[in-house]
Amino acid sequence: MATSSSVAAASKRGGGLYWALLSVPVVTFGLGTWQIFRKQQKEELIATLEAKLSKEPAALPTNPADLAHMEYERVAVTGTFLHDQEMLVGPRTVTREVFSGMADLPEAGVQVITPFRLADTGEVILVNRGFVPEAQAPPHKRAAGQVEGTVRLEGIVRHGESQTAFVPDNHPEQNTWYWIDVFTMASNRSALPVLIDATAECTPPGGFPLGGQTNITVRNEHLSYIITWYSISAITLAMWVFLRRKGGNRSGLRAPPPRRT
């Protein structure tokens, strides 16, 4: 027969376990609530991006510092391309959302970054003209797309890219580029650290480079996370209540019956 001290110790251990198990529904409920706030933030971000992309193109600010808060906004510029200074960044894949009808378009290729001299100030900026298949990367194989003279184009302000662990280092001295480092590219071409992505409408008659390669992907899967965390919270809470009720009937967790005299 269990002594009163052993029963008390068992009850204490059982009580501690119950409260430890209760932390699971509490924590998962908190995670579900946090995902609600994340979902609201993501929806606000998406709305902001859509508003920027839907606005009419603005003039490019004369002060590059003014572009700090203009990423993904549309701008219009007039000037001339400096094709002899272009830089090829790759390997890259084409953004098929823009050219969904071109089923035979190769997947692998590069993006063409070309210095662009502004007509009004004489300053040079960088323009990502878009995608070119690997076979047509050499300029002489896409001569029709090397537009000459003064042109007006619309683009989307970008801040460049960050190098990830799996992307090699750029080699400016060899004109070899794996990722878009705006400041290094601009310095290498005596340009302002300003980059715009040419829109799809800026694709030249020759077909390449294919503009409209700005890839804006904002994942918003927070609703599924909310459902998941709240479901786990509800299930584990129900399990906790069930175990809590059953625990009192288990051996060692219930006080022995009173002795008969």
UniProtKB/Swiss-Prot annotation:
What CDD domains is this protein classified in?
Answer: SURF1
Q: Does the keyword Transmembrane apply?
A: yes
Record's Gene Ontology CC terms? Answer: mitochondrial inner membrane; mitochondrion
Give a Pfam family name. Answer: SURF1
- Topologically, how does it sit relative to the membrane? Multi-pass membrane protein
The primary location reported for this protein is: mitochondrion
Q: What does this protein do?
A: Probably involved in the biogenesis of the COX complex.
Give the family per the record: Belongs to the SURF1 family.
Name of this chain's protein: SURF1-like protein
